[in-house]
């Protein structure tokens, strides 16, 4: 499976670990997606490693395997949560079971939702609450968090990596072509 991660490199340090859902026919239960959609997630490999978002519960094992292969034995420092809708956040608890020393990065609304969705998840000492425009240095990669409330849900934020000029936008991407 390591070979798959190698093929999914965005840059030398950014690896796509998302999953594809070819069976879904409606995005958000209303928009036709005849060829399915992708749940986006990435690993940023730097002095401190970050994982961007989780995926739908149905794809948890595949996603965790993708993450494991991208990490190649390393341990993530951060899991960055940009959106708490269940098809993006369902695997937070599973991720923390596999990587219990990881810190979760999110805004205050994110953590309110996490405590409501995952009542048994103990994040004592593992929360990094960010404010709008706050930066997080991973090493050479510097991430800036930009809040976008009600673009979709109230806690939504996007993350900009100024090193590689990459925006992580959290949402699944419906497509008219095969992903």
Q: Language-model features: where?
A:
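Conformational gate/switch positions in structured elements
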Residues: 14, 54, 84-86, 173
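Histidine-centered active-site/metal-ligand motif
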Residues: 83, 88, 141, 152, ...
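Active-site metal-binding motif and surrounding structural segment of the metallo-beta-lactamase
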Residues: 58-105
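Conserved small/polar residues in nucleotide/adenosyl-binding loops
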Residues: 169-175
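Short catalytic-loop micro-motif centered on adjacent basic/acidic residues
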Residues: 50-53, 77-81, 145
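Metallo-beta-lactamase
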Residues: 2-12, 106-156
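Conserved beta-strand hairpin/beta-sheet module of binuclear metal-dependent hydrolase folds
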Residues: 7-67, 71, 158-161, 165-168
